[in-house]
Amino acid sequence: MKILLENPRSFCVETKRALSIVNLALKTWGKLIYVNHKIVHNNYIINNLKLKGVIFSKNINSILESSKLMLSKHSVPNKIKKTTLEKKIFIIDATCPLVKKVHKKIHYKNKNTYNVILIENSQHPKIQGTLERYQKNLKNSIYIVKSKKYAIKLTIKNTRNSIITAQITLSSEKIYPIITILRKKFPAIINSHENNICYATINRKTAIKHISKKIRHYSCH
């Protein structure tokens, strides 16, 4: 059997940072550290953290008052932060800086009466937090685009005050065909997606494509 290893692999910088934060929290306060979402898609690490005393809970109401709660790198809706204040829960914020950057951009454009076209997968935790940063009003709105089909059907009243952004971990193969359709339909629209790309995700997906070609090569010989 031939084993192929491709680079980059393992976790991104922000995932490593989140793991360091939760381990530091355990060292500082001991057991009963709550985390609102799985830090990493790795059951071995998650189970190991549970054994150390980390409690993963999406239900904010189940968290005891005056506890320690770590916000995972995916971010959380504002309503959760409000509840933590009411219950005097100490927050440890491990939100990915790139996710925060998208939140700030959407909040700023919202205040300045911009429409936002968000290319996304609405089931992802990152998006749940993002959507809450946008307050709909009579002057502007947020438009969710999940596919090329959604982009083709989309109608916007004022495209001059509109921007495109996207879930930072979506693949370029999914995003750019949608952006192409939107730019053709709405030439005045601003594409601000390039500054929000998670390059760790892109590099890993590129590596997977590269190694898949190697696998096909070896399987043919």
Swiss-Prot record:
Annotated isopentenyl diphosphate binding sites: H41, H74, H124
InterPro entries, sorted: LytB/IspH
Keyword line: 4Fe-4S, Iron, Iron-sulfur, Metal-binding
Cofactor: [4Fe-4S] cluster
Binding locations of [4Fe-4S] cluster: C12, C96, C198
Cofactor binding, note field: Binds 1 [4Fe-4S] cluster.
Residues noted as binding (2E)-4-hydroxy-3-methylbut-2-enyl diphosphate in the record, renumbered to the chain: H41, H74, H124
Positions bound to dimethylallyl diphosphate: H41, H74, H124
PANTHER family reported in the protein's UniProt record: 4-HYDROXY-3-METHYLBUT-2-ENYL DIPHOSPHATE REDUCTASE
Listed name of the protein: Putative 4-hydroxy-3-methylbut-2-enyl diphosphate reductase homolog
Native organism: Buchnera aphidicola subsp. Baizongia pistaciae (strain Bp)
Organism lineage: Bacteria, Pseudomonadati, Pseudomonadota, Gammaproteobacteria, Enterobacterales
Gene name per UniProt: ispH
